[in-house]
Amino acid sequence: MGTVKPAYIKVIARELLKKYPEVFTGNFDENKRLVAELTNIQSKTVRNRVAGYITRRVNRGLVNV
């Protein structure tokens, strides 16, 4: 089993998906770039975790586009 994502990662990702549902795709690298542009997150690790969580939600169809 994998680890559970921290709540702050989920909150940031859900807010981004709520504001920009049509922007994000199932491509991690593209989402990583978008998260960097749309937020002021300085930490590379946090940025990647947010992008990964968004990618997972999009690929699983948990986003209302």
From Swiss-Prot:
Pfam short name (any one): Ribosomal_S17e
UniProt keyword annotation of Ribonucleoprotein present: yes
GO biological process, one term: translation
GO molecular function, one term: structural constituent of ribosome
Listed GO CC annotations: cytosol; ribonucleoprotein complex; ribosome
Keywords assigned by UniProt, alphabetized: Ribonucleoprotein, Ribosomal protein
PANTHER family: 40S RIBOSOMAL PROTEIN S17
Family designation: Belongs to the eukaryotic ribosomal protein eS17 family.
Protein name, UniProt field: Small ribosomal subunit protein eS17
Organism whose genome encodes this protein: Archaeoglobus fulgidus (strain ATCC 49558 / DSM 4304 / JCM 9628 / NBRC 100126 / VC-16)
